[in-house]
Amino acid sequence: DEADYRELDIFEFPDADADCRFGTDAAGYLLEMTPRDGSAPARYRMAYGAAAARSDITPGHNPALFRFGVWILFNIAALPLGAVAFHSSVIRYRGRGVLFLGESGTGKSTHTRLWREHIPGAELLNDDSPIIRATDSEALVHGSPWSGKTPCYRNESCPIAAVVRLSQAPHNRIRRLRPIESIGALL
């Protein structure tokens, strides 16, 4: 019902050249993605506390609208369980995960590829959107069905050893971030 709809965000989805609206109403969450080419919008609805959703998406829609819609709804369902997907690339090395965060085009996939090529035992866990889950005793990183430039769909997990925020620069440097910088790097 439009009368009780509350818009939470409006944003662009460049992968499908679409404009997105995300909001809530009395029944739950609503995600609507409208392609700029004039084709039919894709809508997803998920009730509060539900683990399932409904959509009007059809085989004629851009597949990116399906992948992104399911990713958003997965995050809504996973958050109360202490889990969230992060835009990052993850290496597993010696049984622990190292997440590389950064804006698109920063070199996350390149960085993890270089680890695999030059560090024996380094393997890719996920290349775009791993799931991070906090338990009472540790933080874990899980592979996911969403991968990036390098197809990698592993149903595996490991404890997190480090989170590295990448930025492009004319020099190589690494430093530990202060706590407030760390929060900003994750968000």
What role is predicted for each listed range?
Residues K108:
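Conserved lysine of the Walker
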Residues H111:
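Hydrophobic positions on the alpha1 helix immediately C-terminal to the Walker A/P-loop
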